[in-house]
Amino acid sequence: MAPPKPSAKGAKKAAKTVTKPKDGKKRRHARKESYSVYIYRVLKQVHPDTGVSSKAMSIMNSFVNDVFERIAAEASRLAHYNKRSTISSREIQTAVRLILPGELAKHAVSEGTKAVTKYTSSK
């Protein structure tokens, strides 16, 4: 699932430049989706007085995308092995345990479980 439109301070704004092609019709540039807004929010929760450069934000965004793709691919593989057509929280949890090392996996699983519980209780 891709993140929604960026809106917070400190995030890179998407290009809204309107170009005029040969046929005379206006075309808008596609918006580049990123996790920069959410990375910035987490940074401000952890270190309110610390900033982040655009290069560092780009690296963090690449990192989040990479981890997301690895977990999604592993969860997809697990669902296929078990002849399931739906990826559930169980597949995601198992994928996280397989991909992330030791203590990091334990923390990720507990935070994920907490997030799923919060989401289901709010419905």
From Swiss-Prot:
<keyword id="KW-0158">Chromosome</keyword>
<keyword id="KW-0544">Nucleosome core</keyword>
<keyword id="KW-0539">Nucleus</keyword>
<dbReference type="GO" id="GO:0000786">
    <property type="term" value="C:nucleosome"/>
</dbReference>
<comment type="subunit">
    <text>The nucleosome is a histone octamer containing two molecules each of H2A, H2B, H3 and H4 assembled in one H3-H4 heterotetramer and two H2A-H2B heterodimers. The octamer wraps approximately 147 bp of DNA.</text>
</comment>
<comment type="similarity">
    <text>Belongs to the histone H2B family.</text>
</comment>
<dbReference type="GO" id="GO:0030527">
    <property type="term" value="F:structural constituent of chromatin"/>
</dbReference>
<feature type="cross-link" description="Glycyl lysine isopeptide (Lys-Gly) (interchain with G-Cter in ubiquitin)">
    <location>
        <position position="118"/>
    </location>
</feature>
<dbReference type="GO" id="GO:0046982">
    <property type="term" value="F:protein heterodimerization activity"/>
</dbReference>
<dbReference type="GO" id="GO:0003677">
    <property type="term" value="F:DNA binding"/>
</dbReference>
<dbReference type="Pfam" id="PF00125">
    <property type="entry name" value="Histone"/>
</dbReference>
<keyword id="KW-0832">Ubl conjugation</keyword>
<dbReference type="InterPro" id="IPR009072">
    <property type="entry name" value="Histone-fold"/>
</dbReference>
<dbReference type="GO" id="GO:0044877">
    <property type="term" value="F:protein-containing complex binding"/>
</dbReference>
<dbReference type="InterPro" id="IPR055333">
    <property type="entry name" value="HISTONE_H2B_site"/>
</dbReference>
<dbReference type="InterPro" id="IPR007125">
    <property type="entry name" value="Histone_H2A/H2B/H3"/>
</dbReference>
<keyword id="KW-1017">Isopeptide bond</keyword>
<keyword id="KW-0325">Glycoprotein</keyword>
<keyword id="KW-0238">DNA-binding</keyword>
<comment type="function">
    <text>Core component of nucleosome. Nucleosomes wrap and compact DNA into chromatin, limiting DNA accessibility to the cellular machineries which require DNA as a template. Histones thereby play a central role in transcription regulation, DNA repair, DNA replication and chromosomal stability. DNA accessibility is regulated via a complex set of post-translational modifications of histones, also called histone code, and nucleosome remodeling.</text>
</comment>
<dbReference type="InterPro" id="IPR000558">
    <property type="entry name" value="Histone_H2B"/>
</dbReference>
<dbReference type="GO" id="GO:0005634">
    <property type="term" value="C:nucleus"/>
</dbReference>
<protein>
    <recommendedName>
        <fullName>Histone H2B 2</fullName>
    </recommendedName>
</protein>
<feature type="glycosylation site" description="O-linked (GlcNAc) serine">
    <location>
        <position position="110"/>
    </location>
</feature>
<feature type="region of interest" description="Disordered">
    <location>
        <begin position="1"/>
        <end position="32"/>
    </location>
</feature>
